[in-house]
């Protein structure tokens, strides 16, 4: 087997190393198409939609079966350049692609990662905004918004407030994309600060303290995810590397306690797509000079790889009926971790739960039938590149009339009336709101 891998590594193509410069749409497309052509066995390039001005929203998939999902292989994604003037993430993802494909069958760790994970990489969600930026600029400049002047990170449905704004083509493309894949883990790459921010970004109630937090039922996992990234970035982990910016202990923060925002993408991923997403602020300067790019790559390379590995935390498996047929649309959740929109199995009966080591009670609920409780322990040292596997075989037979095949949609309206008591979210007072404007303006 090792000898076969060696020969395959020798047969894989060699593409010239990607240079450290900003790649505009034409150059980015040329690079992505070259990778897809030269590494066709492990990559798949496709567009999930178009921007306002008709530019493709490219996604490169890296994996052993890049064109299709395979049972037991979790789906991971990185998205960058949501704000067109925040450019470091865009280039880092191009270099990550270059590193992954060139290391396959050469570096054992990267090979295992690609063989056990389906990795989706979108270097630019806002190509129109990027092309609108005239030159490097550390602060607010043209290009943050899309061509229609919408901030895409305020454009998604919001669970806490009625975010009744016109959904943009780029936003709608992401929303449709989330319906086509069972994404488990994600990160959204930004610039203008140096911190890993985790959900929620919005919240409910009203006490008016800036330092209040809005916590998810999976706050322990989210803090772990954010710290996993920040701790491997030598500058982010210090927490105070940007002048005139807030100090972030250990380089992480709850998004709401930094400043509340409505219609953010990471909350939408978690609530409506059952995908854990954090926001990575990668540079104090939004659009730094090109000569700084190698430094950013060196600072973030280990973090980018280690974060992908976290998709294998916890437990995964399938739910079957008594005949062995997979059951779709079954609620599979940890007892006492109630989500706004319940986590459900996909059409193949699969579920993925990101959990830290420990003992849990898993609640499996089939619509119209009884719930089934199972205790399990996730070991501290699990098998590399694989979550604990636990299938459920239920004593019932699936019938289309009794169990819906399609997942019911969660209401796209404020859900504060239905929020469980675990949420510590608070709305800031008017005075606190103005205190946060400086953060919002320069983010």
Curated annotation (Swiss-Prot):
Q: Is DNA repair one of the keywords?
A: no
InterPro entries, from UniProt? CarboxyPept-like_regulatory, CPM_N, Peptidase_M14, Peptidase_M14_domain
- Membrane-topology annotation of the record: Lipid-anchor; GPI-anchor
**Enzyme superclass (EC):** hydrolase
* Transmembrane helix found in the keyword field: no
Q: Where does Zn(2+) bind?
A: 83, 86, 190
User: Which SUPFAM superfamilies is this protein grouped with?
Assistant: Carboxypeptidase regulatory domain-like, Zn-dependent exopeptidases
Cofactor(s) the record lists: Zn(2+)
Covalent lipidation (GPI-anchor amidated serine) residues?
A: 423
- What CDD domains does the record point to? M14_CPM, Peptidase_M14NE-CP-C_like
Under the heading PANTHER family, the entry gives: CARBOXYPEPTIDASE M, PROTEASE M14 CARBOXYPEPTIDASE
Name this protein carries in UniProt: Carboxypeptidase M
From what organism does this protein derive? Mus musculus (Mouse)
Where is the organism placed in the taxonomic lineage, from the top?
A: Eukaryota, Metazoa, Chordata, Craniata, Vertebrata
């Amino acid at each position: 087997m090792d000898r076969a891998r060696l020969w395959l590594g020798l047969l894989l193509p060699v593409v010239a190393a990607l240079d450290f410069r900003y790649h505009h749409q034409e150059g980015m497309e040329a690079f992505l198409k070259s990778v897809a052509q030269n590494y066709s066995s492990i990559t798949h390039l496709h567009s999930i939609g178009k921007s306002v001005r008709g530019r493709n929203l490219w996604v490169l998939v890296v994996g052993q079966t890049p064109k299709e999902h395979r049972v037991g292989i979790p789906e991971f994604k990185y998205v960058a350049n949501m704000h067109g003037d925040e450019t470091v993430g865009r280039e880092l993802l191009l270099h990550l692609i270059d590193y992954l494909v060139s290391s396959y069958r050469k570096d054992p760790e990267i090979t295992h990662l690609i063989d056990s994970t389906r990795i989706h990489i979108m270097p630019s969600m806002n190509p129109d905004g990027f092309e609108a930026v005239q030159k490097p600029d550390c602060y607010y400049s043209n290009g943050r918004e899309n061509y229609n002047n919408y901030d895409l990170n305020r454009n998604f449905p919001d669970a806490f407030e009625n975010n009744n704004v016109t959904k943009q083509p780029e936003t709608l493309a992401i929303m449709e994309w989330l319906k086509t894949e069972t994404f488990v883990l994600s990160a959204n790459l930004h610039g203008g600060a140096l911190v890993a921010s985790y959900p929620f970004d919005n919240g409910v109630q009203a006490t008016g303290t800036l330092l209040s937090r809005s916590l998810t039922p999976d706050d322990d996992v989210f803090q772990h995810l954010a710290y996993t990234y920040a701790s491997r970035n030598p500058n982010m982990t210090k927490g105070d590397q940007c002048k005139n910016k807030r100090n972030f202990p250990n380089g992480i923060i709850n998004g709401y306690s930094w400043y509340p925002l409505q219609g953010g993408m990471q909350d939408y991923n978690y609530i409506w797509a059952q995908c854990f997403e954090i926001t990575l602020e990668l540079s104090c300067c939004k659009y730094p000079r090109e000569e700084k790019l190698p430094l950013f790559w060196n600072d973030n390379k280990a973090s980018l790889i280690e974060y992908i590995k976290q998709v294998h935390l916890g437990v995964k498996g399938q739910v079957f009926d008594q005949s062995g047929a997979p059951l779709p649309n079954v609620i599979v959740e940890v007892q006492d971790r109630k989500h706004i929109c319940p986590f459900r199995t996909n059409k193949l009966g699969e579920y993925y739960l990101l959990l830290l080591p420990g003992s849990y009670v898993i609640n499996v609920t089939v619509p119209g039938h009884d719930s089934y409780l199972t205790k399990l322990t996730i070991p501290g040292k699990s098998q590399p590149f694989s979550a604990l596997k636990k299938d459920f075989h239920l004593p019932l037979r699936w019938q289309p009339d009794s169990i819906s095949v399609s997942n019911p949609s969660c209401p796209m309206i404020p859900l504060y009336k239905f929020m469980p008591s675990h949420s510590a979210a608070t709305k800031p007072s008017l005075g606190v709101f103005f205190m946060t404007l400086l953060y919002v303006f320069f983010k």
